[in-house]
């Protein structure tokens, strides 16, 4: 049996199959069915693609062989998806004409689908790349189902399996090539970015004994806006308005949470509040953030060869400080770069970052111990800690900001940071409680002192911005650019935007 027939059998679904959910991915060719075992309740993610007749499989193999043997394909064609699609279409016509075959248009369309999938895409896992409901793709080796993380159904096994090491190695080689990096027996672990912006982590069977493995972290093409997060219940309008005020006045914030808790999505949404004219430098290992035009995105570079210098987060942060940024954003702090970030905040730069930690106490412990080693007296430089977590919401899961805490000072007697809770999520009612403060050591007190703005004026401004954010939710302003434009307009004509929102105009 040919490889194509084996693959076809793996993807073929029984005609009497019933699904909990069924939706198109790339119609009319690929679909997804979420199957549920009635006995165990176990869910399976079924990737469904067109079935091929024996004749179609033979033609497909013939075309693939011809393309592989044809070493004269111009490099410009190989690098251009549109030109490559045209080239594949011509190859199909050429093979059919050569063999004097008349094939229905439906068959030609299927041949095109599989050729584009296998030569330009990612082979049998290509459907997973195109499904917008998938957040993560995990392959744990040979002869075991690929697992995905579905936005609705969470962790699911799929009906996609790599039965041989050769087949898995072929896909891994494709992934490595698309990252533009190198992997070898000497360096069997790779972190890279795919052309779509997705993060890929790959290990060879030198270190993963079940065979090569890969994990792909997908990111939304259109990132969540602050309005999206309000609608999802991750934050409240008042909480969003609070972060807006802090961003405007160049206060520092740290978003903390466990893996897949929504840290990056929240951090990216908050950055929308940065004034367009402000210069921003972001520093990440893999580029995930999206900001306005006056933005320099920096990413680390690992070294795989002697003579090629590794570029770390610490190196990039030192470089960023020489570029006179108004705001520095570090995708995730985990080492010595944390100390440099705190130093940059101390000299007046706005700063934002994320950190892996499951509570405020864990954040403090991570910051003051190796390898970050932040002196206790410097902790209040990070004005605000935002703790986000993944929570159960009835029969599904979501993300919620569990708390917003201000580090106001260091207690002189205990030498411990003094924390003030500003927002707290109530799990029973799924609402956010706001704790107003006129304390001069609070963040509003700090803004008041530095900018000579009465604290009550800041509280009033908080209410105004809450009205605007509620209005955006009510009228359905969700597009990233539309949300950004309203925020930009508010900076230039605050009364005009507020009055439109207050009166509820659409």
Give residue ranges: language-model regions.
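Switch/coupling sub-region of P-loop NTPases
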Residues: 242-256, 265, 269-391
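N-terminal accessory targeting/assembly segments
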Residues: 1-183, 503-506
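Terminal-proximal interaction/regulatory segments of ATP-powered molecular machines
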Residues: 464-506
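Conserved nucleotide-binding/hydrolysis micro-motifs of P-loop NTPases
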Residues: 51-52, 143-144, 152-154, 164, ...
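Conserved glycine(s) of the Walker
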Residues: 262
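P-loop NTP-binding catalytic core
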Residues: 139-252
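Conserved P-loop NTPase
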Residues: 384-470
């Amino acid at each position: 049996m040919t490889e194509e027939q084996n693959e076809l059998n793996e993807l073929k679904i029984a005609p009497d199959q019933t699904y909990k959910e069924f939706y198109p991915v790339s119609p009319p060719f690929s679909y997804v069915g979420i199957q549920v075992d009635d006995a165990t309740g176990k869910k399976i993610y079924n990737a469904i693609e067109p079935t091929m007749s024996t004749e179609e499989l033979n033609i497909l193999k013939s075309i693939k062989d011809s393309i592989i043997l044809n070493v004269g394909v111009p490099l410009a064609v190989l690098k251009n998806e549109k030109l490559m699609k045209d080239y594949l279409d011509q190859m199909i016509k050429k093979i059919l004409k050569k063999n004097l075959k008349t094939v229905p248009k439906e068959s030609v369309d299927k041949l095109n689908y599989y050729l584009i999938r296998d030569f330009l895409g990612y082979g049998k896992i290509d459907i997973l790349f195109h499904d917008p409901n998938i957040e993560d793709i995990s392959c744990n080796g040979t002869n075991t189902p690929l697992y995905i993380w579905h936005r609705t159904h969470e962790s699911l096994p799929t009906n996609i399996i790599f039965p041989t090491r050769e087949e898995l190695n072929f896909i891994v080689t494709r992934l490595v090539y698309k990252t533009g990096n190198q992997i070898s027996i000497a360096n069997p672990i790779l972190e890279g970015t795919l052309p779509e912006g997705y993060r890929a982590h790959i290990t060879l069977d030198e270190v993963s004994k079940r065979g090569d493995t890969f994990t792909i972290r997908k990111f939304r093409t259109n990132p969540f806006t602050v309005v999206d997060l309000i609608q999802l219940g991750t934050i409240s309008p008042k909480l969003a308005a609070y972060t807006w005020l802090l961003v405007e006045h160049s206060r520092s914030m740290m978003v903390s949470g466990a893996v897949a808790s929504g840290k990056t999505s929240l951090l990216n949404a908050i950055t929308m509040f940065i004034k367009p004219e402000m210069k921003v430098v972001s520093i990440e290992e893999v580029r995930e953030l999206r900001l306005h035009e006056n933005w320099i995105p920096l990413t680390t570079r690992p070294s795989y060869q002697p003579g090629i210098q590794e570029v770390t987060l610490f190196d990039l942060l030192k470089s960023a400080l020489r570029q006179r940024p108004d705001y520095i954003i570090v995708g995730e702090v985990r080492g010595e770069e944390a100390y440099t970030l705190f130093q940059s905040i101390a000299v007046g730069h706005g700063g934002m970052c994320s950190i892996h930690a499951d509570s405020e106490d864990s954040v403090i412990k991570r910051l003051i111990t190796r390898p970050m080693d932040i002196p206790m007296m410097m902790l209040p430089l990070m004005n605000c800690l935002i703790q986000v977590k993944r929570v159960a919401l009835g029969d599904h899961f979501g993300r919620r900001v569990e708390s917003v805490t201000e580090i106001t000072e260091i207690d002189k007697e205990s030498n411990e940071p003094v924390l003030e809770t500003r927002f707290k999520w109530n799990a029973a009612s799924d609402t956010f409680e706001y704790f107003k403060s006129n304390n001069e050591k609070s963040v509003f007190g700090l803004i008041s002192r530095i900018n000579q703005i009465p604290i009550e004026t800041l509280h009033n401004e908080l209410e105004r911005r809450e009205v605007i954010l509620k209005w955006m939710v009510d009228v359905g302003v969700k597009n990233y650019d539309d949300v950004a434009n309203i925020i930009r307009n508010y900076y230039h004509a605050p009364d005009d935007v507020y009055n439109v929102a207050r009166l509820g105009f659409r």
